[in-house]
């Protein structure tokens, strides 16, 4: 009897391990990338409203942080495929104290800044949020007024 229970528990452990190895569980309409799930939402919101939407969608979700050229390229391709009509897209980088000190809403490290040429420029002293720039294929960033409305990219773990 003891061996049966031990064998059963062993099989359950193997089954759970295999399930977990799938990169578990992004919803079918989300992009899975390096352990995270990403989704573009095309309902235009201000930057603050977009961040709040991501947070309410699931605890731990935020507007997307981007940390490498590879991640940026993969997300640019995903966003381009999803938003056929174009339009810039909010990400989770902002300057909450308006001192040109950029921070991710998920509190991750700032280590990658593919600004489009001439950016960030803080035009009209009012650009404290960051968007993926559509005319350059979503691979570069632009600072923009947080009150502007845009599509947005959420990043979660499920």
UniProtKB/Swiss-Prot annotation:
Expressed by the venom gland. Disulfide bonds join 26-37, 54-154, 129-146. Residues 33-155 form the C-type lectin domain. Its main location: secreted. InterPro entries: C-type_lectin-like, C-type_lectin-like/link_sf, C-type_lectin/snaclec_domain, C-type_lectin_CS, CTDL_fold. GO terms for cellular component: extracellular region. A motif (Mannose-binding) lies at residues 119-121. Keywords: Calcium, Disulfide bond, Lectin, Metal-binding, Secreted, Signal. Pfam families: Lectin_C (PF00059). GO terms for molecular function: carbohydrate binding; metal ion binding. Residues 1-23 form the signal peptide. Gene3D superfamilies: Mannose-Binding Protein A, subunit A. Ca(2+) binds at residues 127, 142-143. Mannose-binding lectin which recognizes specific carbohydrate structures and agglutinates a variety of animal cells by binding to cell-surface glycoproteins and glycolipids. May be a calcium-dependent lectin. Belongs to the true venom lectin family. This is C-type lectin lectoxin-Thr1. It comes from Thrasops jacksonii (Jackson's black tree snake).
């Amino acid at each position: 009897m003891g061996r049966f229970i031990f064998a059963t528990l062993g099989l359950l452990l193997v089954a759970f391990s295999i399930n977990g190895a799938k990169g578990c569980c992004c919803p079918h309409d989300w992009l899975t990338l390096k352990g995270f799930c990403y989704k573009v939402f095309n309902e235009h919101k201000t930057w603050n409203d977009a961040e709040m939407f991501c947070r309410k969608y699931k605890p731990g979700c935020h507007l997307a942080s981007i940390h490498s050229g590879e991640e940026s390229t993969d997300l640019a391709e995903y966003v381009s495929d999803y938003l056929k009509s174009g339009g810039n897209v909010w990400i989770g980088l902002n300057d909450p104290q308006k001192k040109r000190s950029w921070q991710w809403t998920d509190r991750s490290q700032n280590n990658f800044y593919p600004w489009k040429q001439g950016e960030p420029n803080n035009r009209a002293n009012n650009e404290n949020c960051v968007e993926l720039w559509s005319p350059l294929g979503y691979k570069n960033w632009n600072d923009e007024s947080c009150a502007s409305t845009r599509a947005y990219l959420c990043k979660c773990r499920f």
